[in-house]
UniProtKB/Swiss-Prot annotation:
Subunit and partners: Homodimer. Heterotetramer of two MnmE and two MnmG subunits.
Protein name as annotated: tRNA modification GTPase MnmE
Species, as recorded: Nitrosomonas eutropha (strain DSM 101675 / C91 / Nm57)
Lineage: Bacteria, Pseudomonadati, Pseudomonadota, Betaproteobacteria, Nitrosomonadales
Cofactor binding notes: Binds 1 potassium ion per subunit.
List of residues binding K(+): N225, T244, I246, T249
Length: 451
């Protein structure tokens, strides 16, 4: 991927619309602008221009914005042609730019150039894509915070504190005769504890943001005819799955995404789990267990008239031990019970009626609580973190935990210094201060063309 040539792309979505935008970025765009527009636009002023082809015939007329470097999105000269949003017009404008020496931009290349020219750090650049992809209002707000640098600022504060501690440890290594007293007088233990506390706070906010971005996979499982498909329909507010009195009606996984308080939930209805000689149903049951392996949470539905049966215990025994399970006692309208939540050492159980709707709101609340979402603070203060961010934060947390041990071992300060260095490196990878070219290519390849 070259970074010193001129790139162009249609920056608006495919299809017809009132406005379409062709974006161009590069060095010395004056000649290209004068050729297409007849003259160079005034910087940072919206102007009305004719867009000209190679024969000086008008392709379209629209608004032009010109941002000379370095005061632009990419840090290079940027020209935006705002025309009528028809595919033919947009393609003619883009073709004209390519005729004049620009090349078609690769996905995410405008934002990559912004990163390389230090207009954005890597976390902010990812915030651009996350804002575009946000599916809920809370997710969009979190993405804006990342784009504005709040997540990066928190990471930079951690890195700065780590650097201060590393300087202290490295100085101690250079003057071994001062070793123990020097570390104690500088309160190194307290410094490390403070960093660990702040890291835990950032990790918590990042986990909440990750929930907003990726949502949670919730698998509905249990014996046939306990109300799994009916619950899917009730939560989705639509007749997504076929419901009958015939056991084994659901033969395949049925997926539906919903939103609860801004959190995307990806519901997966599965075939009823039982012993069967039906080949098709057996395949459905195999798919049910495969879906469970990928789940963040399992709802085990049981018939509230009979409670958790021997067959239900057999299902529970096959579930991954670390997987959160919420037992849902359905059909309380038939058993005369009241909707409620029960929690004990065996986990959480909720009693409801899918048919009447009694207890459904309780279920919504418990779903969020089970996955660690704090309703009272919603998305406030959350960072739109990706899986790579969480992995880096968790790796840094583990390294600092090991560093805590070595800090109390005066003859192992070299290992302590290395653990702190690696923790700093892990955190710096989030903002791109320590990042491989392969990772950059993977991140930006998932962006839109034109962004």
């Amino acid at each position: 991927m070259k970074n010193n040539d001129t790139i162009a792309a249609i920056a608006t979505p495919p299809g017809r619309g009132g406005i379409g935008i062709v974006r161009i970025s590069g060095t010395n765009l004056e000649q290209l602008a004068q050729t297409i527009l007849g003259k160079l636009p005034d910087p940072r002023h919206a102007g009305l221009f004719n867009f000209l082809d190679q024969n000086n015939q008008v392709i379209d007329q629209g608004i032009v914005l010109y941002f000379p470097s370095p005061n632009s999105y990419t840090g290079e000269d940027v020209l935006e042609l705002h025309g009528h949003g028809g595919p033919a017009v947009m393609n003619l404008l883009l073709t004209r730019c390519l005729q004049l020496g620009a090349r078609l931009a690769e996905p995410g290349e405008f934002t990559l150039r912004a990163f390389l020219n230090e207009k954005l750090d890597l976390a902010q650049a990812e915030g651009v894509a996350d804002l575009i992809e946000a599916s809920t209002a809370n997710a969009a707000r979190c993405a804006v915070r990342s784009l504005h640098g709040e997540f990066s600022s928190a990471i930079h504060q951690l890195v700065s504190a780590l650097i201060d501690l590393r300087v202290l440890v490295e100085a101690t290594l250079d003057f071994p005769e001062e070793e123990i007293d020097f570390l104690q007088s500088a309160h190194a233990v307290e410094q490390l504890a403070s960093i660990q506390t702040k890291l835990e706070q950032v990790l918590s906010a990042s986990r909440r943001g990750n929930l907003l971005q990726e949502g949670i996979k919730v698998v509905l499982t249990g014996q046939p005819n306990v109300g799994k498909s009916s619950l899917l329909n009730r939560l989705a507010g639509d007749e997504i799955a076929i419901v009958t009195e015939i056991p084994g009606t659901t033969r395949d996984t049925i997926r539906q995404s919903i939103e609860i308080e801004g959190i995307p939930l990806h519901l997966i209805d599965t075939a009823g789990l039982r012993e069967t000689s039906d080949i098709v149903e057996q395949h459905g049951i195999a798919r049910a267990y495969a879906a469970i392996e990928q789940a963040d949470l399992v709802l085990l539905l049981v018939d509230g008239r009979y409670g958790v049966t021997k067959e239900d215990h057999s299902v529970l025994a096959r579930l991954p031990k670390e997987l959160p399970v919420l037992t849902v006692h359905n059909k309380i309208d038939l058993s005369g019970q009241l909707s409620r939540i029960e929690e004990d050492t065996s986990g959480t159980a909720i009693y409801l009626s899918v048919k009447s709707g009694e207890g459904i709101e309780l279920l919504r609340t418990v779903l969020l609580k089970t996955v660690g979402w704090q309703t009272n603070i919603a998305g406030e203060g959350a960072y739109m973190a990706r899986q790579r961010h969480l992995q880096a934060l968790l790796h840094a947390k583990e390294l600092l935990k090991r560093a805590e041990t070595w800090l109390h071992t005066a003859d192992q300060l070299e290992i302590l210094a290395e653990e702190l260095r690696l923790a700093q490196q892990a955190l710096s990878s989030i903002t791109g201060e320590f990042t491989s070219d392969d990772l950059l290519g993977e991140i930006f390849s998932n962006f839109c063309i034109g962004k």
